[in-house]
Amino acid sequence: RLEKKDSSLFHTLAQAMSSIVYAAEKKEIAVSVDCPENLIISHDSKWTSEALFNLLDNAVKYTPSGGKISVSVVQWEMYVEVKVTDTGKGISESNQAAIFRRFYREEEVHEQQGVGIGLYLAREIVTRQGGYIKVISEPGKGSEFSIMLPTK
């Protein structure tokens, strides 16, 4: 059950980041974060952190050694956008809707561990808080996932 309350998005993001730092370092992936420390929004910190972790974990998994992952937070009028951008393998346009289905995995990624529920779960968590997730991606160019959370 989700419990939204006013809390620091910086803290929520830091929680998610702490779970991927080691894996990113091991692959020599440069990770940058740009998030205002004083940004307070109404969200379920525990579950939002889980959703962010799922995006970050995928970014680490599918970004080759020496790649880059950047996380930025932008406050719009109605939403706060948490954007996770990577220099990974990318996702073809024809697969971009399917990646949010439960147990969906692309053909080419079976060497990676996973059961295909990370993005499904992330979308459920965000949707139940009145937000949405969008993706922009191109094979060979990486991916950009944005979690949009309502400011109210």
What is the predicted role of each segment?
Residues 3-18, 32, 74:
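A conserved beta-strand-to-alpha-helix junction within the catalytic ATP-binding
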Residues 3-7, 25, 30-40:
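Conserved catalytic submotifs in the C-terminal HATPase_c
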Residues 59-60:
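Short helix-loop "hinge" at the ATP-lid/N-box region of the Bergerat-fold HATPase_c
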Residues 91-103:
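Short conserved segment of the HATPase_c
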